[in-house]
Amino acid sequence: MSVMFDPDTAIYPFPPKPTPLSIDEKAYYREKIKRLLKERNAVMVAHYYTDPEIQQLAEETGGCISDSLEMARFGAKHPASTLLVAGVRFMGETAKILSPEKTILMPTLQAECSLDLGCPVEEFNAFCDAHPDHTVVVYANTSAAVKARADWVVTSSIAVELIDHLDSLGEKIIWAPDKHLGRYVQKQTGADILCWQGACIVHDEFKTQALTRLQEEYLDAAILVHPESPQAIVDMADAVGSTSQLIAAAKTLPHQWLIVATDRGIFYKMQQAVPDKELLEAPTAGEGATCRSCAHCPWMAMNGLQAIAEALEQEGSNHEVHVDERLRERALVPLNRMLDFAATLRG
């Protein structure tokens, strides 16, 4: 597997942690959000990594809790005129690309993703220009501008299948931005992949030594790992997959104890799926190591109840997602290819 671009390790400034709300304040904002959703003909589309109270509210109001692929499907098909996307910025952009006629609101437009930040479009365009004979495949965790340069967009839930398909056609591939997922896919498929060197600040922090210690403490536990994790963590897994695939694995595996190496936001839906099983966070610190994200995306945490209420009430430049029309049309092509390919897999 070739690697051409190795940016300096970036230390992204984390946003301040949201101020905790009192029980009364939470109740107030929950009721306000429910009322505003009805008034605005809006629906919530929330990612698995948002806080449990946000996922619960999405459930209660007829919204969607899912991975980024299903978020894209749900938002495009739902009849609501407004989508409230609880996630990070690229998810709001993707919703606007697929549903330009709808108003796309986010609790904050400052909710970033380290994979998106780690793949600036100018550098990525130069990288692609240097390898014009490669098919460009980018992860969903990228900006609209990077998607517009791509031949395909992909999510982790269909990454192996898509790359296997392209490899069967004899295509050489540029993969961006996640190096760990890229290496995992290359190992699974044997494809010729030229890999960008980005990483998720959450998954990159899982620690092998500390996980080994935890495994020794819970000998009968299964280890579930998202493929954005380092190879050494993936090698320890009993199941590897996207968020939705890990929830499915939790139901299928016979183990009573499950050690989960992904953002702890997934525990809300995973525990619903396996109420009789015990879920443990894979360690991001220990054995002398420390963590910054500590198994929860700091930008996902920005999707609080107060911010959601303000987005629905205020709209405006602080909350509404806009994508340049020419850019949107270009980014729509690889996104539609992804959705069409995913539909063939669903059969």
Swiss-Prot record:
InterPro entries: NadA, NadA_sf, Quinolinate_synth_A_type1. Its EC number is 2.5.1.72. It comes from the Bacteria. Its main location: cytoplasm. Keywords: 4Fe-4S, Cytoplasm, Iron, Iron-sulfur, Metal-binding, Pyridine nucleotide biosynthesis, Transferase. Binds 1 [4Fe-4S] cluster per subunit. GO terms for biological process: 'de novo' NAD biosynthetic process from L-aspartate. It is found in: Cytoplasm. Gene3D superfamilies: NadA-like (3.40.50.10800). It catalyses: iminosuccinate + dihydroxyacetone phosphate = quinolinate + phosphate + 2 H2O + H(+). Coiled coil: none annotated. GO terms for molecular function: 4 iron, 4 sulfur cluster binding; metal ion binding; quinolinate synthetase A activity. The keyword Methyltransferase does not apply. One of its GO terms (cellular component) is cytosol. Catalyzes the condensation of iminoaspartate with dihydroxyacetone phosphate to form quinolinate. Belongs to the quinolinate synthase family. Type 1 subfamily. This is Quinolinate synthase. It comes from Shigella dysenteriae serotype 1 (strain Sd197). The lineage of its organism: Bacteria, Pseudomonadati, Pseudomonadota, Gammaproteobacteria, Enterobacterales.
